[in-house]
A protein has these predicted regions:
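N-terminal capping/lid subdomain adjacent to the active-site entrance of alpha/beta enzymes
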Residues: 1-130
């Protein structure tokens, strides 16, 4: 699967219910959406980093920078047969697991579309209901 480009978008999201943790309460979130484009298809994933470095040292802003400055140059214009190949190319990027995972998940989505199977099948699922 050849990766032609990566697009990053920030989306505001109001939560249906206030989310309370030991780090505080959230009603609104910033979402980083990662889109991989390849072979006429699009793969999507959400980066799960938060706005502040509380739960993790990664944030929406650091993930954006890492994907744009370090991940994209390692994957755009290259072909990967499997997610493992993609992760091998990204192995030198250390300490930014949420950023790398978002790109990996977008690749899984892209690959499932290329295989014309649901993502749960591409990930090895066997049953429709759990």
């Amino acid at each position: 699967m050849r990766i032609d480009r990566i697009e990053l978008r920030e989306l505001p999201m109001r939560l249906r219910f206030r989310f309370q943790t030991s780090f505080g309460a959230e009603q609104d979130r910033r979402i980083l959406l990662v889109t991989l484009f390849g072979e006429g298809l699009e793969g999507y994933a959400e980066c799960v980093a938060g706005e502040a470095p509380g739960y993790s040292s990664e944030t929406i802003d650091t993930c954006w920078t890492v994907i744009e400055s370090f991940v994209a140059p390692r994957v755009v214009g290259r072909s990967f047969a499997t997610p493992d190949e993609l992760l091998h190319a990204l192995a030198p990027i250390r300490g930014h697991d949420m950023a790398v995972a978002a790109v990996e998940m977008a690749f899984w989505d892209l690959q499932a579309k290329a295989w014309e199977v649901p993502l749960w099948v591409a990930l090895g699922g066997h049953e429709r209901q759990v």
